[in-house]
């Protein structure tokens, strides 16, 4: 799905699938949806991506209930700049951001994970937590990788206390144990 697609038919299919997701979310009582930004380096010119994404979201958001938030997630984004520009220009409380900390630490990103937080903080609604070694999107447990996870979580708690978090691991037990060992969770 690509809100910034060059082809109008792809944008139409994207809007249709998002409508279906909204409908399912309403039925399930879900009020926060995470959507990939759609940016692919070397495919989209950054200016085009931003311009087309802003136009798409301005047209689509009136269909989103006032109590629902769509959060754009970084996947192949090189920096937080394009996503923050889109949300700032759209200027609608129903559109926010999702920081995928692991994606910010892959070969696609030119910006270290800690440097994604401050620019995204005013718009950050959700966070995906997993670790890796700085190259591939391994979805390793929080304590296994090169991301300074304790520092990341401390800054997230300070700058984005209302954001929700998802642990994105095949097996969450090691990450839950790490969170408890670091004092983020009680060991019940």
State each model region's role.
Residues 20-26, 31, 80-188:
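Histidine-acidic metal/acid-base catalytic patches
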Residues 1-2, 40-42, 131-136:
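Conserved radical SAM core fold
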Residues 3-96:
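Active-site acidic/histidine proton-transfer and metal-coordination neighborhood
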């Amino acid at each position: 799905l690509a809100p910034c697609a060059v082809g109008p038919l792809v944008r139409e299919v994207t809007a249709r699938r998002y409508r279906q997701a909204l409908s399912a979310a309403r039925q399930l009582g879900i009020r926060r949806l995470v959507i990939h930004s759609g940016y692919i380096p070397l495919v989209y010119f950054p200016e085009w991506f931003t311009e087309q994404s802003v136009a798409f979201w301005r047209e689509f958001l009136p269909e989103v209930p006032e109590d629902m938030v769509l959060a754009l997630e970084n996947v192949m984004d090189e920096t937080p700049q394009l996503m923050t520009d889109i949300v700032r220009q759209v200027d609608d409380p129903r559109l926010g951001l999702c920081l995928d900390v692991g994606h910010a630490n892959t070969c696609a990103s030119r910006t270290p994970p800690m440097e994604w937080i401050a620019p995204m903080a005013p718009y950050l609604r959700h966070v995906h937590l997993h670790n890796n070694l700085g190259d591939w999107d391994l979805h390793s447990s929080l304590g296994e990788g090169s991301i300074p996870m304790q520092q990341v979580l401390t800054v997230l708690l300070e700058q984005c206390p209302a954001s929700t978090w998802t642990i994105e691991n095949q097996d969450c037990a090691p990450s839950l144990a790490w969170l408890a060992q670091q004092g983020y969770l009680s060991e019940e």
